[in-house]
């Protein structure tokens, strides 16, 4: 997993819980989940109480078509249930925003870290991936800024808004769609 933000954590935990034997999160910065800590003014707006995926996709600037599938497979209710199953209760505010019951973002960080630890996910901070190559056999070779080398059968890029993930994907031959901000409104 390249990226130690919430998407990287959710993907790593899910992979480990579904039986992937060795899951490693490589995070470029000294600490994982840093943006979660500051989101929502330190409270972390986890999701929004919008139960119909078709309604939810209408709130995103790219429109509904690209998001219909993902939001139908893992909707707001699924997110709420996931956190509840992992020990974090979310509460709805009058405007539909959902925050941790503790009303502090650190509760979300602690929940994700606990779930990762329980699932056997390993975390390596300060590991900015510089090169990602795919061999003819389909295995990946990964190296970071310290020349540490990793091999993997699968790689998931979850670098958030940082351009490094797009560059790595492009280096592998993927076509990149220019990103746009996508906050719920």
Regions found by a protein language model. Give the residues of each.
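Short, structured coil segments at secondary-structure junctions
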Residues: 39-40, 86, 172
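N-terminal Rossmann-like FAD-binding beta1-loop-alpha1 element of flavoenzymes
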Residues: 1-25
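Glycine-rich FAD pyrophosphate-binding loop
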Residues: 16-41
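Residue-level detector of alpha-helix initiation sites
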Residues: 1, 5-7, 31, 156, ...
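Cofactor-binding loop segments of dinucleotide-utilizing enzymes, especially the Rossmann-like FAD-
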Residues: 4, 28, 181
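Predominantly flavin-linked oxidoreductase catalytic cores and closely associated redox partners
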Residues: 18, 106-185
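Mobile, glycine/GP-rich and aromatic-enriched active-site lid/loop segments adjacent to catalytic centers
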Residues: 85-111, 118
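Glycine-rich active-site loop/strand segments that organize a redox cofactor
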Residues: 43-92
